[in-house]
Amino acid sequence: MVADVTVASVAAVLVTASFPCYLYGAWIIIDAETVTWGTLKHHLAYIFAGLALNTVPVVAWMVPQLFDQLGGFAVLHAFFGVQAYALLAFALTGIVPILRAKREYNLYHDPDQDVDLDEIHENMSDWRLRLRAGVIGYVLCWLVAWVLGVARFVTKYRTEF
């Protein structure tokens, strides 16, 4: 059987590798003058890659081991990890209606229309606020969970290296 430290190391590398995907995905949107459908798909490819790199170790290895390790860092690490995913779900309550409204106005395929986003739907500013709050909250909770996870890794496996 594979040693626990090996599996933990692979999980740590995969979760850590997700962060550059998030950063580059964010940069694609920040750098775009207008967000076309192609830009959005390019952005989402990196975001989904980051989510996959992060979620697979969580579901396959961390969650099954959590109840055997409850205490201190493990509880905090799990708490902030769950909060990160909860805030991601909150962000989705903003992005889904935004996507629907922008597609209705054909703003992804014809982005040159002179339309203020807040004018295409009465709730657009609320949806955009949900999206921003959810994404910022996800990233902040993810970073705290990552730091706690690294601290747990170092304290648990430092004698095995």
Residues covered by each model-derived region:
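Short membrane-interface loop/juxtamembrane segments of multi-pass integral membrane proteins
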Residues: 108-131
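Alpha-helical transmembrane-segment detector that highlights a single hydrophobic TM helix
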Residues: 62-99
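N-terminal signal-anchor/start-transfer transmembrane helix
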Residues: 11-32
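Short, strongly hydrophobic alpha-helical membrane anchors
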Residues: 1-6, 159-161
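A generic, lipid-embedded transmembrane alpha helix
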Residues: 42-67
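Membrane-water interface of transmembrane alpha-helices
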Residues: 20-26, 89-112
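Membrane-interface helix-boundary motifs at transmembrane edges
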Residues: 30-44, 70
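Juxtamembrane boundary at the C-terminal end of a transmembrane helix
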Residues: 146-161
